[in-house]
From Swiss-Prot:
GO terms for biological process: leucyl-tRNA aminoacylation. It comes from Thiobacillus denitrificans (strain ATCC 25259 / T1). It catalyses: tRNA(Leu) + L-leucine + ATP = L-leucyl-tRNA(Leu) + AMP + diphosphate. Disulfide bonds: none annotated. The keyword Disulfide bond does not apply. This is Leucine--tRNA ligase. Signal peptide: none annotated. Pfam families: Anticodon_1, tRNA-synt_1, tRNA-synt_1_2, tRNA-synt_1g.
Amino acid sequence: MQEKYLPSEIERAGQARWTADQTYRAADASDRPKYYCLSMFPYPSGKLHMGHVRNYTIGDVLARYHALRGFNVMQPMGWDAFGLPAENAAIANGVPPAQWTYANIDHMRTQLQALGFAIDWSRELATCKPDYYRWEQWLFTRLFEKGVIYKKMATVNWDPVDQTVLANEQVIDGRGWRSGALVEKRDIPMYFFRITQYADELLSGLDTLPGWPERVKTMQANWIGKSTGVRLAFPYELDGSQEKLWVFTTRADTLMGVTFVAVAAEHPLAARAAENNPELAAFVAECKQGSVAEADMATMEKKGMDTGFKVTHPLTGEEVPVWVGNYVLMSYGEGAVMAVPAHDERDFGFAKKYDLPIKQVIGVDGETFSLDAWAEWYGDKTRGQCVNSGKYDRLGYEAAVDAIAADLAAKGLGEKKTQFRLRDWGISRQRYWGCPIPIIHCETCGDVPVPAEQLPVVLPEDVVPDGSGNPLNKRADFVNCTCPACGAPARRETDTMDTFVESSWYYARYACPDYADGMLDARADQWLPVDQYIGGIEHAILHLLYARFFHKLMRDEGLVASDEPFANLLTQGMVVADTYYREDAGGKKTWFNPADVETKDGVATLRADGKPVVVGGTEKMSKSKNNGVDPQALIDQYGADTARLFTMFAAPPEQSLEWSDAGVEGAHRFLRRLWKTVYEHVQAGPVVTRAGGALPEPLKALRRQLHQTIQKVGDDIERRKQFNTAIAAVMELMNALAKLDGMDADTRAVRQETLEAVAVLLAPIVPHVGEAIHAELRPGAAMRWPEVDAAALVQDEIELMLQVNGKLRGQIRVAAGADKPAIEAAALASEAVQKYLAGQTPKKVVVVPGRLVNIVA
């Protein structure tokens, strides 16, 4: 064994051995229990960041732990390879997205391998490869024929200069991020998944996932947004015909307080009203600009304009004005909302702004309603009763809703209804670098799905986008085709699928990536569901919801038998670091990497010029704040095991990890000490196996701590997923071992047992060091998770606290099985008690078994 801890040599040798032996290749046929561990696959941006390192180390610890416990473990890796960043890089660098993507994949694969992850690389997949996306095209055609996928007009962000659709995040202050042009809202045809058909099952299925964080389940439940309310109509007359303006409300009890109705800018009533009203037409046009994101709508200034139209209140017959509101989304509900300013905070602010009537129709005993300012109780449906509502006065929420719904139903103007916030999933993207939608447009036959034998529709990989429109439209060899139904000349669909489609089923394809005759084979049911899924909380809603939805689609196609894709979910926190900047006269900030900054006596200065920089606080590592740490530089300096140990020790996995150079140094020091301890032990020669007999108390105490540590580390990793406390327990054990300096046979035997166990306990976290020292301690022996010796946990003696008159005065050690008289005698004989009793006879002795003795003097 070499004396020095040389991580680069140790890690290179270990990785070469794993590759040669195909150590981490998962067996499809095995009599061992399966454990499928999956971390969310990365976008191949070109470089790993510390967030990746943390994510994949968490997964690797769990995978390696279960392998040591005898499980048949699968931990695959792939690449979420389609998407907008590749197009942007292509525009900037003049290279095809495919070339950029494949080069990045090669580089990032090398980086992942350098970290020593126990990945089965034989299952590697990239979503941009035709042998992957052909099967989502196949599923698309199946679902299109069944009506689960359909086509309709949808509103998007349109850049009139670049002639392209923009994602919500590409709209900055109402302008296109690249062209700077004012963005328009435009209606275009798009394909949609009927995810709403599965809304109830997606909601109820959350109750079958005890291994998911409650926070994530709550976020999904809120996103699905099941609500029971009333769908009701406000009648009106238009051009001599009787029409109805429909709205949905969960607060039908406030219907008597409606003072106006607001419609979306895209609503037919708004368009009709704007025909002869230039001012309204301009406002409608303004509403149609900017983002269509719901989050943006929620935070923007609420604006409106009266259309001049009136509708009739369904119960009172009074006229109610119709306004256009920029906060009303056409894609939600009916594109119209009833406004009750007295009992809805948004409506209250809107009514105050435009001087609209506010009518109180809910009262709470002991509270006084005021028009001056909003009060929380105005919207309280639990304590409120109807007031100023005629026959509904004094009714509580449920009774009022029932009565009003019944009266509306009798008039044919309403009914109780369950509604979901969830909307169908629009997957059309006017992008080049994505999975082609397998539809052919024929003038005679309409939209025709591409037959299975003609799949995949292969995306040309030699395209260099220029940022203006979809380049596929300019490729005659791609667009021009023959209708599979009638044989006439036709055009191929040039939209591509939302990249969330690829990431919604990749976990299943890992089970059978080599299967060429279908989307999945029987191996999918062998491996699914995923036993442990790991990823960031930012994916709590969209990705995880879409993957759950896709799993049900595949189940209903007979491809999988299970209902849910991921049995257990761990959402790790961010990696954060200090930020530093300087600000110029114009307010522009220049950010400096923490490695280039020195802090002394509370003052941060730039190493390059010695001048001060502003400390910007701790934030998520990012390019924009220049506060990232390059994992490769960390590996080069300290080794992969140090990087892994620090990221697992610095914080519990679900919390943010604050970067600390001192913490990295500390992790490296621990590994050096561990190596030195093993080296010195091995150099001392072979260890003679203990013949038996009693051990002296210090060795018994160490063995007790060793087996307590084995017990704790197993529980911390498997059940609690608290890797930091597992590492801390091993460190405490090593500190205890360091205090043993004897070289007798018993001491050396216990030291050997302890170091062997430590090698295995740490192997999931620092696999290169763990395997290397285990090989020195037990040459040729396979690594297995150590068993807890129950006998070692039994204590011969226990320590009890000594109190005199309720105050702590010392401790005593007694035999573990000592009875009450023996404990009392030991307590009274102790020097501490004798001192405080000062010759007095105690009035009472109270023994709390296993904890303390209290002597009342």
